[in-house]
Amino acid sequence: MKEALHLKIPASTANLGVGFDSIGMALNKFLYLDVTVNDEDQWSFNHIGPNVDELPNDESHYIYQIAQKVAETYEVELPNLNVEMRSEIPLARGLGSSASALVGALYIANYFGDIELSKYELLQLATDFEGHPDNVAPTIYGGLVLGYYNGDTKVTDVSYIDTPKVDIIITIPSYKLKTIDARNALPDTFSHEKAVQNSAISNTMISALIQHNYELAGKMMEQDGFHEPYRQHLIPEFQTIKGIAKQHLAYATVISGAGPTVLTLIAPERSGELVRALKREFKDCRSELVTINETGVTTKVLYQR
């Protein structure tokens, strides 16, 4: 009897404007991993469909590297595995593709190494690898998650907000934007005055989200001073998308993660008209309605003869 581990891992959007490196939300676009033990002397990877066709098929694969680091940490040996990989999450577009792969690697190591890590421990590991929880926390738990990673203690604490009752539109450009390039666009420091200002905006946004006051939350999202002023020049479509969204009375339009995907929050009764307007305007981008994922990673184990 052969075991097959099936993982369904959601995409994520990070920051929501001023929640830089600390706020993220899971989305119903998925990375699918089907994992079985093989009879070879090494791991193998089979990539199916777009978004994963450029990835390596050998043990230089990111998922292999992370899984082995986890195995070494817990002093277990993993069997050689075959990983079949399909993905609806485009790479290097600000939708958490690397976080989804990282989380998948942790779940693979946990299962096939029989480590018995809890979700809390998986989150700690994931954040230690990533350096911040904004993508990995919602990927693991689902929903809208706030978190803080203490680099000194290596502990991540998270909190949850009710899923916003809004529609989400993502506009995905055809080009990639590497996170490291988007990081390099940011200033090294902020003045105390700017830090206080951005903290106040972020606090107000969170309070508004808790109260389901999406007009106020959106107003705060669009006043980010942490990253969007320094990254928007890397996304030529950003201001035009923002303008069209405003014409349709959207709550907010922000850069998703490090970009270049642009995320818009809007009332459900207005979302259809807006997404069609964006599709007409941007022939080189893909605009689509997505829903918020509330479950996080789902796992299923099947036994094959």
Curated annotation (Swiss-Prot):
PROSITE patterns: GHMP_KINASES_ATP (PS00627). This is Homoserine kinase. The gene is thrB. It is an enzyme of class 2 (transferase). ATP binds at P90, L91, A92, R93, G94, L95, G96, S97, S98, A99, S100. It catalyses: L-homoserine + ATP = O-phospho-L-homoserine + ADP + H(+). Keywords: Amino-acid biosynthesis, ATP-binding, Cytoplasm, Kinase, Nucleotide-binding, Threonine biosynthesis, Transferase. SUPFAM superfamilies: GHMP Kinase, C-terminal domain, Ribosomal protein S5 domain 2-like.
